[in-house]
Amino acid sequence: MAQILQIAAIALATVGTGAATMSVMNEDIPDLQVPEGQWEATGALDGRSFDVLGVDTASGAVLEDLLVFRDDTFQSVDCQNYCDFGWSDYKTKEVDGVIHFTVTTICPDAPHTVVFYGQVNGDDITVDGTWTTRRWYWTNQIVLTATGKAMPDMAQDASG
């Protein structure tokens, strides 16, 4: 019985000092690093939507999505369907006639953060991104890259 009490005391002391927590936590994985610059909320892509096809760079899984811009906000239909991310503010800058954009979306109900960085040149779009899930015991990140084309009009409702 005394041995059981000793083990319980050691376990409580370990948990109480945080030693157990530190031994099981993974280091954080940073979100996608977006290039610095004069990012502004210009609405430059408002009224446009893009059908994109991409891949998870680690697994090769194919990712299909519709990216929608309206009223200075952005929505990934795939993110909306998965976790009700909603509409997020986006920022742009123009470099040599190409519109660069960035947006960070956060799931309100789970620890998911998605960072997009892309370029729109006419009707063509390229996008890089990270989907990071942070929990106290592990961090997982999906790195994605995608390309796509502008949709003819924004008749589709992405409000989810």
Summary of predicted features, one role per range:
Residues 21-27:
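Membrane-interface motif at the C-terminal end of an N-terminal transmembrane signal
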Residues 2-20:
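Sec-dependent N-terminal signal peptides
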Residues 29-120, 128-130, 134-160:
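Central antiparallel beta-sheet cores of small beta-barrel/beta-sandwich binding domains
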